[in-house]
A protein has these predicted regions:
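Flavin-dependent oxidoreductases
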Residues: 1-27
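Residue-level signal for well-ordered alpha-helical segments
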Residues: 3, 9-11, 33, 63, ...
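Short acidic, gly/pro-rich beta-turn/loop elements at beta-sheet edges
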Residues: 4-5, 34, 44, 96
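Residues forming the flavin
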Residues: 17-22, 27-32, 37-38, 48, ...
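C-terminal catalytic lobe of FAD-dependent flavoproteins
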Residues: 40-97
Length: 97
C-alpha cells in the first residue's frame, strides 16, 4: 500500500503525452494498471509484458523487482486529435473517452 501511494500519491489516472502513449492508475486494492505498448496496424505482440515493462520501469524504476501478475492485449481507440474528450450528459452524469 505504501509503494502504491508513492507511485501515484493523489491516486489520479494518468496518460502521458507521447505519440505512443502509456497510461496508468491504481485499482481499489492498490494494484497498478499500466497500459501502453501500442502497435499500430500489426498483430498483437507475442509477449506484451516484454513490450510494456521497459516503459513501466522508466516511469516507475522502483518496480524493478515487482512481478507482473496479469498482462493482456486489446484494442485501444482514441480520437484523431489524440486529446481526451470529456463532457456532461445530465446533471450528475459525466463521460470521458
Amino acid at each position: 500500500e505504501d509503494v502504491a501511494r508513492s507511485l501515484l500519491p493523489n491516486n489520479m489516472a494518468v496518460e502521458d503525452c507521447n505519440y505512443l502513449l502509456d497510461y496508468f492508475r491504481l485499482t481499489r486494492d492498490n494494484r497498478l494498471i499500466y497500459g501502453g505498448g501500442v502497435v499500430y496496424g500489426a498483430r498483437d505482440p507475442a509477449n506484451i509484458e516484454r513490450l510494456i515493462r521497459p516503459n513501466m520501469l522508466k516511469t516507475f524504476p522502483q518496480l524493478a523487482n515487482v512481478k507482473i501478475d496479469y498482462a493482456w492485449t486489446g484494442n485501444f481507440l482514441l480520437p484523431r486529435s489524440r486529446l481526451p474528450q470529456l463532457g456532461r450528459l445530465h446533471e450528475n452524469v459525466f463521460y470521458g473517452k
